[in-house]
Amino acid sequence: MAKIMLGSHSVKSHGWKVAREHLCDWLILVVLGLIDIVLNVIEPFHRYIGPDMLTDLTFPFYEDTIPMWAVPIICILVPICIFIVYYYYRRDVYDLHHAILGIGFSCLVTGVTTDSIKDAVGRPRPNFFYRCFPNGKPKFHPDTKDVVCHGVKKIIKEGYKSFPSGHTSWSFAGLTFLAWYLSGKIKVFDRRGHVAKLCLVFLPILISILIGISRVDDYWHHWTDVFAGAIIGIFVASFSYLHFFPYPYDENGWAPHAYFRMLAERSTGRATTMTRTGSRGMLGNDVEPGNSASSPHDRHRESTDSDF
């Protein structure tokens, strides 16, 4: 399929126009970020943990294989770098803007959803015992038999945030969006059967899976936490991508909806201008007496008659 190219739509020429049209969306993005910060500050629900429940919570307390600060780099900054590279190849600010806005919504909606569930559920992590009792000596309330933690407050707080996995949900939110994006750009569903295209699309998904596995290996999450996080990330990423872009197998799957809407509006504007110009020309010919010039309609009719 030949791509429709009507001049360059660069950041310099159309960037402010596109951003201004979506100013409300960017403000919502900021609000989502603030909400997620609040959700990370508030205290999660402290689920009851009795002596007989510690069996599955006494795994070693290891450091993260992939620290939390690295997750936004992997799932947001790396995809944005790919979006920018594609922008310099095609010079389409519509694609760049909607890709960045889309992955931002994907990750922040996922973050708010994940952290809301974390705070509400309050599931203890597999390494909760050593978060709660750093010296290895458990202590329980004499009446309720609930744990009485004597560890670092911040570490204990994080110990109640096992379900679902934030690393996993964020990774799938960003990298699934990237997989959708690559599918549309390289036309992975062009029915030519090139396996290399599938490998490229599956690579971000594989990275997300490995990040999720690392959370189980580090004893920071149960496998069900990782599974739930993956479902949330994939679900939100898919909806976010399809909100801004067509399906990758669509004929126009290589560009955002806004790009084709802009082309349609431009074509409509040109057609309206040509119609008005033609109408003024026809009126001028009718007013001038003795003008032998024929109208566009007459010329079209004469041209048609001459063909026969």
UniProtKB/Swiss-Prot annotation:
SMART domains: acidPPc. Pfam families: PAP2 (PF01569). The chain crosses the membrane at residues 26-46, 66-86, 93-113, 162-182, 193-213, 226-246. GO terms for cellular component: membrane. The keyword Protease does not apply. Keywords: Hydrolase, Membrane, Transmembrane, Transmembrane helix. It is found in: Membrane. It comes from the Eukaryota. It is an enzyme of class 3 (hydrolase). GO terms for molecular function: hydrolase activity. The keyword Ribonucleoprotein does not apply. Belongs to the PA-phosphatase related phosphoesterase family. This is Probable lipid phosphate phosphatase 4. It comes from Arabidopsis thaliana. The lineage of its organism: Eukaryota, Viridiplantae, Streptophyta, Embryophyta, Tracheophyta.
